[in-house]
Amino acid sequence: MQTKYEELEQLRSKYPDFSPFVLLKLSMIRYGARLTDAALDRVQDPYYSFGAVEPFGIDFVGRTEKRAMPGPILLRDSSNVYINYGENYSDPYDVDWDEDAGVFFLKEGDRIIETVDFVPRPAFFGKKTSRGTPMEALADVRAQLLILTAFQRCRFWEKGDQCAFCAFFTSGHTMGEVDCQDIYEMIHEAIKEPGRFSEIHVSGGTDFTGEPPFELEAERYIRVLQAIGRNFKGRFSSQLMCPAYPKHLLKRIYEQTGITSYCPNIEVADEALFRKLCPGKEKWVGYREWIRRTVDAVEIFGKGNVYTQVVTGAELAEPDGFRSMDE
């Protein structure tokens, strides 16, 4: 059986013009990574410790409230890899701390694959808003990116229409709709750290309430984006990650806030699998309408400012997905 290292070497040989760090990142996302006891001890240091609060409301079986988790893993090319620490991976890499060398190593068994580090703890973590809300409960951090959750629930779960691969807001510890004053104060504090953040993303669970559907959700995003905007003059580097809205809602959001880009995540590229794996999105928008609205959004946000994302691996979902990588 081929090892992860052998697989990486084969890919690097096959694709010599492809960044070896991107290949490593893809491999780490595929296989996952586990913190050794030595690494977990080391990341309790305040420089690394992100704490135990999970702003997307997910309970990972391998985590404990008594032990803080680090942020994303940093590679030597300055890119970062987000890992769900505590997930039950079947064949993960190990991240180990070498006391003698004073560095973290990514390992497969005893073989050292790469020298790695972790994104440092943001300066605003550990602080509270004037309402007493922990600031780290309001945003997740990816190196220089802040990701805010405007609505820490997803209404697709109410009737079993949630996306099949999603675990967001399932821990029971989330706060529902966030407070706009909390958001303003958290952003105000976060941007005090020189050069730390370059972009703000706003996301959250889906709320189809309103007539037409998503009307109230759009109004919520407007309030949150306006609260963020109080910290800036004019538009600010940002992205709204939400359902595919009709043009009239998107136009309101764009005109009333400082948002600069839009990302309605289709999640699954295949139409039949989309219907099966994303029943809520199919019910309230539909696959083809999702694509049409995404394309239409370019008229509002401009070329190069509209995105989407897919969930890697969904195309292999049984029984309707591809049966092999070759297929």
Which stretches of residues belong to each language-model region?
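Catalytic core of soluble alpha/beta enzymes
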Residues: 259, 263-277, 281-291
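Alpha-helix initiation/capping motif
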Residues: 49, 179, 246-247, 270, ...
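Active-site-proximal beta-alpha loop/turn segments in soluble metabolic enzymes
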Residues: 203-212, 272-279, 309-319
